[in-house]
């Protein structure tokens, strides 16, 4: 993890759990195959630099399309009494898919934000091509809201979300 630019002080005894999304196609009578995947690890920035998945980690932590791997919201003091909090960095606990936009919304209570990512990188004729596309710039954050301090664009007073849970797309109208 430290090689990915995470400050060693922010790594818990269980390592660092970086969130992922897997889309599975059932294979009958049992099992499934991965047809698309997205990993937050492919979309990080760190002021410390580093290497993640064989690629240099961008150092511009103010880029809103990237996750600052060293951002921790210290307002969750009760969580910091639990060493596992450092491991569960984002604590993504909700996901919703919008088929009209082909976009996915996820939330991160530990960072105090929600994110929109592009699912149109999926390629069901060639799943690996879609997985590769999601790992590149096409898989970066399209939109984020809730805590501009997490990417250096605001102060604590600008934060709008606090340890939110559950995200849903709102139907037009």
What are these regions (language model features)?
Residues 1-173:
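Histidine-/acidic-rich catalytic cores in large beta-rich domains
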């Amino acid at each position: 993890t430290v090689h990915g630019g995470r400050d060693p002080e922010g790594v818990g005894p269980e390592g660092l759990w970086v969130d992922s999304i897997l889309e599975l196609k059932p294979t009958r009578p049992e099992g499934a195959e991965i047809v698309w995947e997205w990993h937050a690890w492919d979309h990080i920035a760190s002021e410390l630099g580093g290497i993640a998945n064989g690629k240099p980690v961008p150092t511009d932590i103010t880029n809103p399309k990237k996750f600052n791997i060293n951002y921790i919201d210290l307002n969750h003091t009760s969580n910091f009494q639990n060493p596992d909090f450092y491991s569960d960095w984002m604590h993504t606990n909700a996901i919703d898919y919008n088929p009209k936009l082909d976009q996915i919304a996820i939330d991160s209570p530990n960072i105090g934000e929600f994110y929109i990512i592009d699912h149109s990188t999926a390629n069901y004729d060639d799943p690996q091509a879609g997985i590769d596309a999601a790992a590149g710039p096409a898989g970066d954050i399209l939109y984020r809201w809730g805590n501009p301090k997490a990417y250096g664009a605001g102060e604590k007073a600008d934060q709008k979300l606090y340890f939110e849970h559950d995200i849903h797309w709102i139907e037009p109208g």
